[in-house]
Amino acid sequence: MTAVSTTATTVLQATQSDVLQEIQSNFLLNSSIWVNIALAGVVILLFVAMGRDLESPRAKLIWVATMLVPLVSISSYAGLASGLTVGFLQMPPGHALAGQEVLSPWGRYLTWTFSTPMILLALGLLADTDIASLFTAITMDIGMCVTGLAAALITSSHLLRWVFYGISCAFFVAVLYVLLVQWPADAEAAGTSEIFGTLKILTVVLWLGYPILWALGSEGVALLSVGVTSWGYSGLDILAKYVFAFLLLRWVAANEGTVSGSGMGIGSGGAAPADD
């Protein structure tokens, strides 16, 4: 019992300097973080230029939501690079790495918790959906990210890690339902169905990669190393966030008349106002 307590204490007492040294000694992990920081910086400047001439309120809201994606990402990845949001976890019995200290870049979940709702907000605004549907998508998304974080941080039970993973996936299914079933009809009515369809497929396909990486990486069955998993997440972030946001903002800037023409449907699903 004493040995177990001592080991647990040692893990908890790892300093940020220890974590930073471990990050910097892992080329794959370190490079996956800094490449994302550099790209986020470039994307922020690009998006500022792309959105500077937007005038309609709805187009501006989409632009703000889009801008927040790289802004959140660069902040969160800076936390990873500094070791602030990275730690060592001792995997529980039953895990493939049971008893070993595993580096956990848990700060990624902060990125997703704050950036993915902005992606959904931008998509909802593009589709001119109603506020109830938008609220559902965003809250289910936050639930997905928070329970995913719980699955990654639990060290007391291997089973409970997978239980929370399953709960996170259930939240994800709710998000997929909104994206694939509810919002396409709203986008059709708003006249944005073509670009919405492209971004919807891009989002769904790429977001499916995250739970797969979790399951295959050190947090799951440990078939992939921490560095390889980190590059997988970074690659998905680049495509699902920066490429997605660029395509959306470019379309909005070129079709602002369509965006402003369908009005601010949030809260009404784009429905026309009732006669007096």
UniProtKB/Swiss-Prot annotation:
Stated name of the protein: Halorhodopsin
Cytoplasmic compartment segments: 52-57, 128-130, 181-192, 255-276
Predominant cellular place of this UniProt entry's protein: membrane
Keyword flag Transmembrane helix: yes
Extracellular-side segments: 22-25, 82-105, 155-157, 217-225
Chain positions with N6-(retinylidene)lysine modification: 241
GO CC annotations on file: plasma membrane
Keyword Cell membrane (UniProt): yes
Pfam family, one: Bac_rhodopsin
Gene that encodes the chain: hop
Function: Light-driven anion pump.
Record field: transmembrane: 26-51, 58-81, 106-127, 131-154, 158-180, 193-216, 226-254
Location(s) in or outside the cell: Cell membrane
Record's keyword terms, sorted: Cell membrane, Chromophore, Ion transport, Membrane, Photoreceptor protein, Receptor, Retinal protein, Sensory transduction, Transmembrane, Transmembrane helix, Transport
Organism encoding this protein: Halobacterium halobium (strain shark)
CDD domains in UniProt: 7tm_Halorhodopsin
UniProt family annotation: Belongs to the archaeal/bacterial/fungal opsin family.
Maturation-removed propeptide residues: 1-21
Source domain of life: Archaea
High-level lineage: Archaea, Methanobacteriati, Methanobacteriota, Stenosarchaea group, Halobacteria
